[in-house]
């Protein structure tokens, strides 16, 4: 079971392992957050795993502790294994605070795998460091696969990862504050556009907007919209098809403030005509 919108790789990862991905759609009207009732409706006797991503890429949606706990409890009660992708865990905006499923893993170590890395929260994309917290038996299996596929992380990256995780988080907090400021600026602008639905993201550095009400003969879908925006506005956006949400486009605000606002002004002129 994969709540949708989802990161593009999730379905293919399931296919590569011989499984069948089942997308559980959460619309913009729900803030792109799936409910227990929706998960229950999608459940089949063959279901084995729930993939849970919060904060989310592409939507920036962040489940509250109570929302998360309700979903975790449901999944455990239904006998599902939970894979929690928490790669954006430190990029959560006030009044929310980072909160990990690790609190549940301590109780159910054989039913949960927490997946994380340093690329996003620590801006260490080039160091290629990821890690998993799960049961030791599963760690052995994962090590066997990794050892024959990509090899281990180089020692320099490992040292850098230890320094990042054990050192002061001042730089992470500064980055989080900068992203929150940009989120506020970008969302205020996009939310003012007629016929565009864009929930206010609560984490990561994305906004995900439903633009289906803007479709016409020249722009029949989100992919056509992104092609037009690249051509006419010089702005690259990502259509929602690959994320399981074909009527949406993803905005990233991981750029300088002036670049962000200039880009949004260009997008507005093309989409809204103002």
What are these regions, as identified by a protein language model?
Residues 1-274:
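PLP-dependent class I/II
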């Amino acid at each position: 079971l994969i709540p949708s919108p989802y990161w593009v790789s999730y379905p293919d990862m399931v296919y590569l392992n011989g499984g069948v991905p089942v997308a559980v759609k959460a619309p913009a009207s729900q803030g792109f957050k799936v409910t227990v009732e929706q998960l229950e409706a999608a459940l089949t006797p063959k279901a084995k795993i729930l993939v849970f991503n919060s904060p989310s890429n592409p939507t920036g949606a962040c489940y509250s502790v109570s929302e998360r706990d309700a979903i975790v409890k449901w999944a455990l009660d239904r006998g599902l294994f939970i894979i929690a992708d928490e790669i954006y865990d430190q990029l959560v905006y006030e009044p929310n605070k980072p909160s990990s499923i690790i609190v549940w893993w301590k109780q159910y170590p054989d039913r949960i795998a927490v997946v994380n890395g340093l690329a996003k929260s620590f801006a260490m994309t080039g160091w290629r460091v990821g890690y998993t917290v799960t049961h030791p038996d599963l760690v052995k299996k994962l090590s066997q696969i990794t050892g024959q596929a990509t090899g281990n992380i180089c020692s320099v990256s490992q040292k850098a990862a230890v320094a990042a995780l054990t050192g002061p988080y001042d730089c992470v907090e500064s980055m989080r504050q900068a992203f929150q400021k940009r989120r506020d600026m970008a969302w205020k602008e996009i939310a003012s556009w007629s016929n565009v639905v864009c929930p206010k993201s609560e984490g990561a550095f994305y906004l995900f907007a439903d633009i289906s009400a803007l479709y016409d003969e020249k722009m029949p879908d989100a992919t056509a919209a992104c092609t037009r925006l690249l051509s006419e506005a010089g702005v690259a956006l990502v259509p929602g098809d690959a994320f399981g949400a074909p009527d949406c486009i993803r905005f990233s605000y991981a750029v300088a403030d002036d670049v962000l606002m200039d880009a949004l002004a260009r997008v507005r002129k093309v989409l809204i005509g103002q």
